[in-house]
Amino acid sequence: MRYLSLPILLFSSLFLTACGPAALIGAVGSAVTRTAYENDAKVNDYSQPAGPRNTLEVALANLKLGIGYMNEGLYEEALEKLNRAKEAEPDYPPTYNALGVLYQKLGVYDVAEANFKIAIKLNPADSSTLNNYGLLLCQSQRFEEADEIFMKAANNPLYATPEFAYSNAGTCALNNEQTELAENYFKEALRRNARIGPALIQMSELSYEQEKFMPARDYLSRYLDSNKHSAKSLWLGIRIERELGDKNAVSSYELLLRNQFSESEEAKLLSQAL
């Protein structure tokens, strides 16, 4: 299983140009409702059509709401808000970036690509959009095109988080069975940011597959320093510690996998392996 870091890319960098890195719009809780988002927007009432407003303010308010809805899986509401943002400011690149991600989530890849291309045409140096477009290309198995786009994003000297581009390029290379290239990309991602989770877990998996069990353990340990366990990380830990002969660690990982992810495919694999 390969680990793409799409959510990180969209929601951590979409607003860098317009609002600065502190303007992240993330999930506001597990039970967010349409009313809650609308009330939040009405602090400045910028998402409402009545009265003369600065069009960029209207676009930003609706864009933030659209991403909030997208985080919650409320795609119909997200599309409504993003279309309002586009109507208010038709040449604002981040709106098309968000629309691209939304249509990708909906599986409408041709419309997603069209929106990414508009965003890139409006702002060719936006590495966030390039990164998200690269993910779409990789998902569509257009690996060479994806690699070119990821490297364009990574080589932008103004891009604050090139490690995400390298990590995604590594994942895409793995999907294209280019293991050596993938490893080089993951190592470059970790050189830029030693704590980037997707690269750490992929390097742990690669090290395990290469029977380098001590490095595999080290990469997994570093991953867990800043990331919560998943079914995948626990199953990987079980396999690594079995090879290293640490029965206590194996038992601990197995217990966590059974208790926390009992319905996962990894838990089923564990049952089959016993």
Model-identified regions with their sequence ranges:
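TPR alpha-solenoid repeat register
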Residues: T95, T129, L136, E163-A165, ...
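Residue-level recognition of tetratricopeptide repeat
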Residues: V58, Y92, D126, A160-P162, ...
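Canonical tetratricopeptide repeat
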Residues: K64, N97-V101, N132, Y166-N168, ...
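Structural marker of alpha-solenoid helical repeat scaffolds
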Residues: N54, A88, L122-N123, N156-L158, ...
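Terminal, low-structured helical/coil segments at or just beyond the last alpha-helical repeat
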Residues: L24-A31, Y37-A50, Y223-L274
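Register position in tetratricopeptide repeats
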Residues: N71, K105-L106, Q139-S140, N175-N176, ...
